[in-house]
């Protein structure tokens, strides 16, 4: 961050409004939101700018296809982008549209200043032109088929000759190259920086920055037959968002931008060369960091609007909610996490709905959700539903927490979102392992109440720290975790620097445990949709709410008449409620779990073939219903002393549990 300004300033690119948002644009915008939330936790005033690019020829083409007036068309899509970002818990400060008067006036000011300084000059252009991309190409860039070299376009090029205004980009090549070499963090990641240097070494040509008017776009001052090239126009939005030219005092507090974030396709030619050269010509400071992230790919090829193969983020969040049973707000947070966790920032990543759902189960349901549920459940069982008084940290554990907080903060500051979350979830894994090592159920059974307090206090402190660490990524889920462990505070208001300090969980009563991230059943996990969004070109107001309908009933064959039993037969079964106090997989089998259950004062071992539905960890702390008087049976060298009751849903075992917690050993009538 520049030391002589007060406000941290981050931007997304402004998005073309030729179709609806998808998870590609969501990745960029969510990342900026995460960084902004982190900056706020550091105590920095912030400005987060996003918006829409509405002056391109593509917009007219899309409006024509939709049978709409261009202005009405862009108004509708701009509103949809805003609704989508609000849905994703994105808290931008300013949403700029390039059809706004403030933007048009600033573009005219830039053009006039550069024309007056001799950096914009009139000339004759002759060469290849792509109407769809509004881009001129060198002869060396064009293949023999004379089609657009942009792989997303590929349309036939036109050979044209027309009078145009040119920005003297070539005049800034040496200065720009030297600036990049002198400021190694200016362009990121490093391999993209090298691409820019190679591009400059090929020779920067003066850029045509006007086009013949089609009746849409920003008119060239005093020349109604020409409009300003959409990229020259669009980049100016960053200055406008910072207050230029009408609010110089505000602009001085905000500019230069700390981070421009965008996809790699608009990095080399526009953000990393044209834009810095424009700023140099205007005599303005350059941004601190210009960062290009990778693409979501499908089968190794870029997914996106033109192919319609990336889902709308609202649809994907609804899908997660439908399959998992999590509420919609939590599912949105889960999507935010999955977007940044599935991609190593800067590189491409293959989009797979199945991979997203599998990570939901592994990270959020099995790890974080399970840690929260088992910690609160065991406190309810062993500590009368209370967070214990603060206890000393296990040897080295407080340093472990502090180091993780520091690592995550450093990663967020370096725009490495996945690394930050890896640091948080290592704590989750360590704490789950800590529970297994300490075995609080055994400590309670042996009457070592102090050991139980120490163990569970460590769990609650870990959950507090993890919630604070994931808050920039999952703000709603973080608040739920904090409330679930008895804390009455807003994680967004807790300074990042204070998070790792041990002993901040006071003795307090706990609410009843409610699963935060319910696990997606195995039989639903692979039931992915091929075309998840039907609203790729419709308004979000038309998008249905997440389904609240129950799952369809399972088809069951009629019972034969000779399968009935008498009430006396049923009375022979002794059904009781048991507490699961320990659970582990049975070696060399994929289906069996070895459960240790408590029936009043008695403990038993039971083997159950439910491992394809449940992990061992998520069963600890649950109550189950067992047949208590079943003749013991030895399996895999272990004597099983009962049977757990479970429903069969399409071959998947779903355990039966009491609606509310009851004393262990209670009879089932």
Can you describe what each PLM-predicted range is?
Residues 77-93:
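A glycine-rich helix N-cap at a beta->alpha junction
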Residues 117-173, 177:
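Cys/His-rich short segments
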């Amino acid at each position: 961050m520049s030391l002589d300004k007060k406000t941290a300033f981050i931007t997304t690119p402004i998005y073309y409004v030729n179709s609806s948002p998808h998870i590609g644009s969501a990745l960029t915008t969510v990342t900026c939101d995460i960084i902004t939330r982190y900056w706020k936790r550091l105590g920095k005033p912030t400005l987060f700018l996003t918006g829409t690019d509405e002056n391109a020829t593509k917009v007219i083409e899309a409006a024509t296809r939709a049978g709409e007036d261009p202005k009405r068309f862009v108004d509708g899509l701009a509103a949809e982008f805003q609704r989508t970002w609000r849905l994703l818990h994105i808290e931008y400060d300013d949403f700029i549209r390039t059809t706004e008067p403030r933007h048009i006036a600033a573009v005219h000011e830039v053009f006039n200043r550069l024309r007056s300084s001799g950096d914009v000059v009139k000339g004759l252009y002759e060469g290849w032109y792509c109407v769809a991309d509004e881009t001129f190409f060198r002869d060396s860039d064009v293949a023999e088929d004379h089609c657009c070299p942009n792989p997303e376009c590929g349309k036939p090029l036109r050979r044209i000759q027309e009078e145009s205004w040119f920005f003297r980009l070539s005049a800034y090549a040496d200065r720009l190259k030297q600036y990049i070499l002198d400021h190694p963090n200016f362009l990121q990641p490093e391999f993209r920086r090298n691409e820019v240097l190679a591009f400059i070494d090929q020779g920067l040509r003066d850029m045509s920055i006007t086009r013949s008017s089609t009746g849409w776009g920003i008119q060239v001052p005093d020349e109604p037959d020409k409009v300003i090239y959409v990229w020259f126009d669009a980049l100016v939005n960053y200055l406008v968002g910072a207050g230029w030219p009408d609010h110089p005092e505000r602009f001085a507090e905000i500019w230069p931008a700390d981070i421009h974030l965008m996809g790699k396709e608009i990095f080399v030619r526009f953000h990393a060369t044209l834009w810095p050269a424009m700023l140099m010509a205007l005599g303005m400071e350059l941004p601190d960091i210009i960062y290009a992230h990778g693409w979501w790919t499908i089968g190794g090829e870029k997914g996106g609007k033109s192919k319609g193969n990336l889902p709308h983020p609202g649809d994907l969040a609804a899908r997660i909610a439908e399959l998992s049973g999590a509420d919609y707000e939590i599912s949105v947070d889960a999507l935010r996490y999955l977007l940044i966790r599935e991609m190593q920032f800067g590189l491409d990543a293959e989009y797979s709905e199945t991979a997203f759902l599998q990570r939901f189960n592994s990270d959020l349901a099995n790890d974080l959700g399970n840690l929260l549920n088992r910690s609160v459940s065991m406190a309810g069982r062993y500590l009368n539903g209370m967070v214990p008084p603060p206890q000393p940290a296990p040897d080295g554990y407080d340093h472990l927490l502090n180091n993780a907080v520091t690592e995550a903060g450093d990663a967020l500051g370096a725009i490495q979102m996945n690394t930050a979350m890896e640091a948080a979830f290592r704590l989750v894994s360590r704490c789950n392992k800590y529970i297994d090592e300490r075995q609080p159920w055994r400590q309670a059974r042996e009457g070592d109440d102090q050991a139980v307090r120490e163990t569970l206090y460590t769990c609650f402190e870990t959950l507090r720290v993890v919630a604070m660490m994931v808050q920039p990524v999952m703000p709603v889920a973080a608040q739920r975790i904090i409330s679930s462990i008895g804390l009455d505070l807003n994680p967004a208001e807790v300074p990042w620097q204070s998070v790792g300090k041990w002993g901040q969980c006071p003795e307090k009563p706990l609410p009843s445990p409610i699963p935060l991230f319910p696990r997606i059943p195995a039989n639903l996990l692979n039931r992915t949709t091929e075309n998840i969004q039907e609203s790729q070109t419709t308004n979000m107001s038309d998008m249905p709410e997440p389904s609240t309908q129950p799952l369809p009933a399972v088809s069951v064959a009629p019972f034969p008449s000779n399968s009935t039993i008498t009430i006396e037969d049923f009375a022979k079964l002794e059904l009781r409620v048991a507490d699961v106090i320990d659970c582990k997989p049975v070696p060399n089998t994929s289906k069996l779990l070895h459960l240790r259950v408590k029936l009043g004062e008695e403990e038993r071992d039971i083997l159950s073939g439910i491992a394809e539905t449940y992990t061992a960890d998520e069963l600890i702390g649950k109550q189950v219903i067992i047949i208590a008087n079943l003749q013991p049976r030895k399996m895999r060298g272990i004597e099983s002393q009962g049977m757990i009751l479970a429903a069969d849903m399409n071959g998947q075992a779903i355990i039966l549990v009491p609606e509310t917690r009851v004393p262990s050993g209670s009879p089932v009538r």
